[in-house]
Amino acid sequence: MNTDFPKIYSATGMMELIQKIGFLPLLDSGIDGFSAEDIVDEDCRYVTFPEGGWDWPLWKWKGEIVQEMPCMYGKFFNKKAGFISQEWWPDFCNYRRSKFPRPDEDSIEGTILSTLQSTGSLITRELRAACGFTGKGMRSKFDGYLTRLEMATYIVTEDFIYPRDKHNHEYGWGWSLLNTPEDLYGREAFQCNRTPQESYKRIFEHLKEILPDASDKQIIKLIG
């Protein structure tokens, strides 16, 4: 598929692209060529070393991107992670929340959301413990609830936190620092004077413009 996106070599280049096109899944989106992994230069993709260890510049850029743009990051695209610019967030949020109303406070999702709102940002394992998901097999169940809240735009990733070794070097895959978008940017960041269906139509037409070879079915699946 011809997406006509330039090759990206840095976090700065990725930020400029996200600002320009508005939506960008991190990995496979179901639309050929439309992901950060597809767009970055080969040197910025995941690689393992013969002597052990790995490097993945794109993975390391995520925190810099969400902190410096800023933009929204979470599992927004068919339960997979990606970026949405602040320009497009009000329409995306307007549509998604019309499909997924705020959960009842006495539901599990409602408890997770109210816990996060009362404590402020928490890494995933801290939020899981605060909500009582500490038993065997609870991690995957909790992750499922989190994904639903991210798809509904009630929770986003504020940053990524990495453990440090004895030399104070970051290592590992890192942990998502979760927060609500309202706490991060205020309710004014959500102001949208369109109906949910008008927002949907605006997003659909925009994605058709930047992805001319994608089918309607592919774009509908991406929007959710």
Regions found by a protein language model. Name each.
Residues M1-G224:
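Long, low-complexity intrinsically disordered regions
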